[in-house]
Amino acid sequence: MLRFSANLSMLFTEYDFLERFDKAALSGFRGVEFMFPYDNDIEVLKRKLRDNNLEHTLHNLPAGDWAAGERGIACIPGREEEFRDGVAAAIRYARALGNKKINCLVGKTPSGFSATEIHDTLVENLRYAANMLAKEDILLLIEPINHFDMPGF
C-alpha cells in the first residue's frame, strides 16, 4: 500500500510553516516531511504533529548556507566538523519527533579540491552519518539530484 507524505517545505507555501501541518491533515495526509526543522522549537513541532495526528516521516541533515546557494556540505573538504554537528542536530530532532529517516544532500562539487579529496570527504562523512544514525535505528537516505535541476550537484 502506498503511503504519501506532504513535504511541508514545498506544499501549502501560501501559509506560515506551522499552519501547513493543519493544511496537510485537512487534505488527508497522515505523514509530513520538511527539509530543515532546525529553526523551529522541537516542542512546538511535536505539538503540531500530535494535534493533527501526523507522523513525521523525514527531514534533511543541515545543508550549509541555503540562502547562499549551498545544497549540502557532505562533499566539501574542511567542513567535516560542521557536518558532524549537523548529524547530531538531525538526530536530536529525529528522536524528539519520532522520525526514522534522515536525508543527506551531499552538496555541489566545490572548486579548489581534487576529485579524490571530494570523493574521500563524501565517503567519510556518509560513513560517519550512517554509523551514528544506525545507533539510533534511523535510516540515512541520499537524495540523487541531477545536474540539470541543480547545476554542480
Where are these regions (language model features)?
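N-terminal pre-domain/capping segments
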Residues: 1-95, 99, 127
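Active-site acidic/histidine proton-transfer and metal-coordination neighborhood
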Residues: 73-153
